[in-house]
Regions:
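Charged- and aromatic-enriched interaction segments used to assemble
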Residues: 81, 87-190
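Acidic surface patches and DE-rich sequence motifs
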Residues: 6, 13, 61, 77, ...
Length: 190
């Protein structure tokens, strides 16, 4: 059974009529933040409390977190029905800048450096714990550089998983925090 929370307050559960949401669509894709879109009527208790870019949304399946994100739009139509669109936590990598750099070393070191830099620039709920890195280079030695600063998301894309190393980014939601993994093969999509 799926449930949705807004800042740890129950927003949707299928067995409580007053917490009804409509047209719920959760999209999770490879190497992407994913999206959550839903509609809510003005009779919903949280109708006026959801705030763009600050309310954290969490989707659970049988008490297991499968997706987290934030609201990026909340359009209201003439019938006073809101359409809420959310972006997944991986999109938070757009909230920080990775400076120009020259790097030589192991892939996991570069990935760790990029994520640690991101964490130093953002709030607590936008941070990631560095998770599993199963990507390997034949020599365990790569060279990467950029002559200009990049959004962290672009740095991860271009210098890690869209490079010759490839792989998949995955966010794991564990009790002790949200881990970002860079995997050679997917374990599961989140």
């Amino acid at each position: 059974m799926y449930t949705i929370y807004a800042d740890d307050v129950l927003l949707y559960t299928p067995d409580v009529e007053e917490l009804c949401l409509y047209d719920i669509v959760l999209t999770m894709e490879d190497n992407s933040a994913g999206t959550l879109i839903f509609r809510m009527t003005s009779s919903h208790p949280a109708f006026d409390s959801l705030k763009k870019l600050s309310t954290m949304i969490r989707v659970e399946d049988s008490r297991r977190v499968i997706w987290k994100g934030r609201i990026i739009s909340d359009d209201r139509n003439i019938d006073n029905i809101k359409t809420i669109q959310c972006e997944g936590k991986m999109a938070f990598l757009n909230d920080s800048i990775f400076p120009e750099f020259e790097f030589s070393g192991a892939p996991d070191q570069l990935f760790g450096q990029i994520i640690e830099n991101h964490n130093s620039q953002v709030g607590e709920n936008q941070r990631f714990l560095i998770g599993d890195v199963t990507i390997k280079d034949n020599n365990d030695y790569i060279v990467r550089s950029s002559e200009s600063a990049l959004k962290t998301w672009k740095a991860v894309k271009e210098k890690c998983f869209q490079s010759a190393l490839s792989g998949h980014l995955q966010i794991r939601y564990d009790a002790d925090g949200d881990y970002i993994d860079w995997l050679e093969d997917y374990q599961e999509i989140s």
